[in-house]
Amino acid sequence: MAHMAQEQQRRREINVNGWPAIVSAIALGTIGVLSFIIQPGIVQGYVEHLHVSDARAVDLVGLEMLGVALATIFMALVGTRIDWRAIVAAGLLIAAGGDLASALASHAPAFGWLRLIAGFGEGMIISISFTFVGITAKAERNVALYLVLLLSYGAFGLWYLPVILDRIDIGGLFIVFAALSTLALIAVLFVPHGYGAAELARPGVRQLPTALLAVALMAVLAYNIAQGIAWAVLFLVGTSAGITEQVVANALFLSQAMAVAGALASVMLADRIPRDVAIAGGILGGAASIALLLGSPGVLLFTLGVCGFNILWNFVLPFILGRIGDFDASGRMMSFAVAMQMIGLGGGPLIAAPLIDGKGFRTVELVCIALFLISFVLLRIPTLAHRRLHAAA
């Protein structure tokens, strides 16, 4: 009798489809991206307030994202065997510690490494949040709700960031991040301890061979490297074209606000349009949006480009993660997909930094566009194999 009671309690604790778990994941996931979601403004803040070069500023955010990527690799390999509550609590404390240390040593040589440490904590939080949101029965809806919250924060964060930095400087911003991460420990109580295979059943799942799963992961990696490159340099692209900082911030605010509409559109259209159509439109449209920024765009063209990029990014991401989840019956694929996502977002700035030559961003933008196209082609390969298996069932 006691064993049955314990089993019932265990099942309640790992119900990833329950609203307490979903809401906690959405809130904690937003805490995990406090820095990343306003990264273009952070880059400009480093240039203006730490007096570093454009390339060094991009490199600094790249180090933070490298920490995120390392954490998600760790999580993909061993993290799912550890109590999720312990992981999230540790991630919050590491992120808070890294942010606080960064605030106290913003001009020190070790600043970049402190950002990497903060990024490692952020990556632990992000990995768990994305993993159990992504494996829920209504993955597209839940990922989209996640995006709505973090984009709402990002929109206002980018809009007000120049003013905030003028008042409290970079160090003050990191103190705020540390405080929010500490407060978020309250939400750990609502995080499930793990997940069970029973919660992973989805009618569209077909198990693909390992080689095709690897191709799918390479597609996710290429797509997110492109996103990481673009997101790191957007502010610099605008200012290098002669647009003032506040006008660039306004354009990015508008793009974040409209990206909320993109995420909501994925909720409303998830069951109304073919997933493959949504993915094609999102990825190829993202490439076209970056193409609008080639050369020296004016305010209108810059605004159109960044808005298109951000809307489509947040529209297509739930569809991509939903598609990836359909390739693997065990549900473990989602952990690796999140790792590839974070490696790409972290590697993007590191790839972009040496391509910035002080003369413009054309090379960076062309590499970004090429990676979008490569990701689309790669994702089609396992998608077609999945379609054949689904038709034969």
Regions found by a protein language model. Name each.
Residues 327-361, 368:
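A late C-terminal transmembrane helix in Major Facilitator Superfamily
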Residues 114-149:
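Cytoplasmic helix-loop-helix junction between adjacent transmembrane helices
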Residues 71-84, 262-275, 356-357:
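Helix-to-loop junctions at the C-terminal end of transmembrane segments
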Residues 86-100, 277-292, 366-369:
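Structural signature of the two symmetry-related core transmembrane helices
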Residues 40, 212-253, 257:
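Extracytoplasmic gate region of multi-pass secondary transporters
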Residues 136-139, 144-193:
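Helix-loop-helix hairpin linking two adjacent transmembrane segments in secondary transporters
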Residues 70-107:
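Conserved MFS/SLC helix-loop-helix module at the cytosolic interface between two early adjacent transmembrane helices
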Residues 273-320:
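C-terminal transmembrane helical hairpin of 12-TM major facilitator-type secondary transporters
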